[in-house]
């Protein structure tokens, strides 16, 4: 096996490990298991919500911010794609029973998330001009 093949094999194993960690993260998120949900983050991770301008620094602060939300959340993962250090999850977040279509972009450093950016969109009725 040459150097390139070894590198690709290692990359494939790492991708499988990250995917398993993501599956565990989203399952814990859906169960409102805040301890397990936040194991995926580096201690100095950054979480950004560009739509509101919020930026939370540090795994403990991210966990505390999410744990302080007054209602339980539900997560329905629709798709996870990625490789290497960049992974994207598309999911439906239900908060107080209202769905929000959400995209999470996670940037990994090693086996932990260093930065996550999330975008949220409420459902809407398609305009008549697009109904063809």
Give the positions of each predicted feature.
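Hydrophobic alpha-helical elements and their junctions with loops/disorder across both membrane
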Residues: 28, 35-36, 52, 96, ...
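A solvent-exposed, acidic/Ser-Thr-rich amphipathic alpha-helical stretch
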Residues: 15, 34-84
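Short, low-complexity N-terminal intrinsically disordered segments enriched in polar/charged residues
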Residues: 1-39, 43, 131-132
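A beta-strand edge to alpha-helix "cap/lid" segment located at domain peripheries
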Residues: 2-13, 63-132
């Amino acid at each position: 096996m040459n150097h390139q093949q070894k590198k690709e094999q290692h990359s494939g194993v790492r991708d499988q490990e990250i995917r398993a960690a993501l599956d565990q993260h989203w399952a814990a998120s859906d169960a409102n298991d805040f301890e397990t949900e936040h194991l995926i983050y580096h201690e100095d991770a950054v979480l950004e919500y560009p739509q509101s301008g919020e930026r939370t620094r540090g795994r403990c602060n991210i966990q505390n911010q999410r744990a302080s939300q007054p209602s339980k959340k539900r997560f329905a993962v629709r798709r996870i794609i990625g490789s290497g250090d960049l992974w994207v999850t598309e999911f439906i977040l239900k908060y107080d029973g209202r769905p929000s279509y959400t995209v999470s972009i996670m940037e990994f450093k090693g086996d932990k998330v260093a930065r996550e950016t999330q975008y949220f969109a409420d459902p809407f009725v398609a305009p008549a001009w697009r109904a063809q």
